[in-house]
Amino acid sequence: MQKKYDTTVLGLYVLDILGRPVSKIPEGGNLEYIDELRLTVAGTAGGTIIDCAKLGVSTLGVGAVGDDEKADFVISTLEKFGVDTIGFERLKGVPTSSTILNIRPNGERPALHLRGSCDYFLPPEKQKVDIYDCKVFHLGGTGLLKKLDGPVSVDILKEAKKRGCITTWDLIGATQETSSIVNPLLPHIDYFMPSIEEASIMCGLEEPEDIAKYYLDGGVKNCVLTMGGEGSLFLNKDNKIITPAFDINVVDTTGCGDAFDAGMIVALIKEMDIETSLKFATITSGLVATGLGSDAGIKNYDDCIDKMNSFKIKS
């Protein structure tokens, strides 16, 4: 049956304020100069959905913003990229979730985060739109979705599976305690896509394959662990695939994991084979690292395919 949307992306939507390069914070009330400053829509849902939209698939955003000027920027930016924002809630008396990122010369990104609207987000019982009318349903931001984390997220993913969606998932801010809200989700996740660091923190294991097996044993169908400059590890009951990273000039790693998620989502929509899917997700992730912000680097689908087939693999 034809679906209205290629993908629904539900979860953490954040306004990012990024500056680079920041070698130090000025002492007292002093001033330092930087070369670049940007505002972007980011977060484990926001960064992913904008990249999906840039890659040409139809998108429905589901999340929450506050009732401030930051909310206006988030919604207008999503709509500029072609995201359907009918699934958004505007919450009275709450600030929009936002992050200040000071990007170091080596691409590291220490952050100051205002939790805000995402702490209060719950999809209303009566939706303005069918959020499950999609091919791929992505839940992004577990760990920073105070009201959504836990049984509500389990019910959302169960319903997505019941409705015939492919389910994909990612988180943010993992701790050992996060496993208590993540483990009940595992049987309802088709593609589990955290970073190796986050996955390791939650399960207490260190070897990538052991980590992936832990989550497969928990019920995940396909485990994809992103490993930064080392590429990614894919594991399911039939295949183990290590995909190397591309050789790129890193400017800022903000949103690279979100871009990997977007690449996998688009690859699933396009019905690519798993090896090509992983390679495509790797190039989308790598391209984002070449500029400032979670929406940098990616131009369109064809450009990503060209770069996937022409860029050198990191040695």
Which sequence ranges carry the predicted segments?
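Hydrophobic beta-strand scaffold residues
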Residues: 59, 85, 167-168
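Conserved phosphate-binding/catalytic loop of the ribokinase/pfkB sugar-kinase fold
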Residues: 90, 101-146
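Conserved beta-alpha-beta core of the PfkB/ribokinase-like small-molecule kinase fold
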Residues: 136-213, 231-232
